[in-house]
């Protein structure tokens, strides 16, 4: 049967999709004559009727209950082609039958190869966006699905990169992406002295992955001093929470500087004291930070000294849920509670 495309319209693609489904994937099975060709172009995953709206609207996940049939053979982590129920090609993503998130999309272009050039393009786009929008001295350079690199986070702390991988399919690309990012950064005169992996979150179990924590490449001093919003921090990328620091809270911390001058402030779950220190540097009269972790409190106190705020900003090891009723019973009052 002959099909002629008279423009890249939704209608013409729907017609094409129906031809594919009716004449190539008859009854959702592979004809022997087509098997070799389809295998070369990856497995085809067809969604149930009515599914796929999320992907068309910009989503990146396909759940197990959205899939109708899988035509072809694959292993977990392989890149597969995704079609809607009518055979319309929706793009490519990697598949993992161990996960409820069965497919994580990498591209919405069915004819796009997932190769080194593709990954470089994704990394370059991610870096270009950060250069346009944020202070890049320390920032989240790669943010998973938002950068079409699903399950992968790469944080930059000055001249150190910290990597967190939470998806099986991304494991095969992880070190290539790190190398490509170092190349992209070097083109802007940025030299990376070390890379550390913090893929130690429990979410990896859902992907059938073991936890990984350690150096990618040569070892280096993993205590990194960064400056954010005028506040200095010593970040421990090995023992700190997540990748060592909550970089995504940068502008929330900055907002504290606008409202805390001359105020009495209580910072709950202070971690490394980031919100408390932003309040202190803005001129708060008195700041108390609470955290249940002794290690976090020690880090927060060290950061207070680093910013010469130890006379104004104080930290205490306590369970916030126990401490708040005690403070209320004692009649303590605060202007700002974080």
What name fits each language-model region?
Residues 5-8, 22-23, 28, 34-37:
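Intrinsic-disorder-associated, low-complexity terminal segments enriched in Asp/Asn/His/Tyr and depleted
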Residues 35-158:
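Non-catalytic accessory regions of SAM-dependent methyltransferases
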């Amino acid at each position: 049967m002959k099909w002629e495309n008279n423009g890249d319209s939704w209608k013409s693609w729907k017609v094409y999709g129906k031809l594919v489904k009716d004449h190539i994937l008859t009854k959702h099975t592979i004809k022997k004559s087509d098997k070799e060709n389809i295998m070369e172009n990856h497995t085809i995953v067809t969604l149930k009727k009515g599914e796929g709206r999320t992907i068309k609207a910009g989503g990146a996940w396909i759940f197990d209950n959205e899939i109708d049939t899988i035509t072809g053979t694959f292993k977990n982590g392989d890149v597969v082609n995704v079609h809607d129920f009518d055979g319309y090609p929706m793009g490519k993503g990697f598949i993992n039958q161990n996960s409820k998130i069965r497919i994580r999309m990498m591209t919405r272009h069915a004819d796009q190869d997932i190769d080194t050039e593709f990954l470089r393009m994704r990394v370059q786009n991610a870096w270009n966006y950060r250069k346009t929008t944020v202070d890049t001295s320390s920032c989240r350079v790669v943010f998973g699905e938002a950068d079409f690199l699903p399950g992968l986070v790469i944080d930059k702390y000055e001249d150190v990169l910290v990597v967190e991988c939470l998806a099986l399919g991304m494991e095969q690309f992880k070190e290539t992406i790190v190398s490509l990012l170092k190349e992209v950064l070097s083109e802007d005169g940025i030299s990376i002295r070390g890379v550390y992996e913090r893929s130690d979150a429990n979410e990896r179990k859902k992907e059938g992955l073991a936890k990984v924590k350690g150096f990618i490449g040569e070892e280096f001093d993993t205590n990194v001093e960064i400056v954010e919003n005028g506040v200095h921090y010593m970040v421990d990328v090995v023992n700190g929470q997540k990748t060592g620091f909550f970089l995504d809270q940068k502008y929330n911390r900055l907002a504290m500087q606008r409202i805390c001058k001359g105020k009495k402030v209580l910072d709950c779950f202070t971690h490394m004291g980031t919100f408390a220190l932003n309040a202190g540097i803005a001129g708060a009269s008195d700041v108390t930070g609470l955290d249940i972790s002794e290690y976090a409190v020690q880090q927060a106190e060290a950061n207070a000294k680093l910013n010469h705020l130890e006379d104004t900003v104080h930290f205490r090891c306590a369970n916030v849920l126990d401490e708040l009723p005690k403070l209320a019973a004692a009649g303590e009052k605060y202007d700002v509670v974080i």
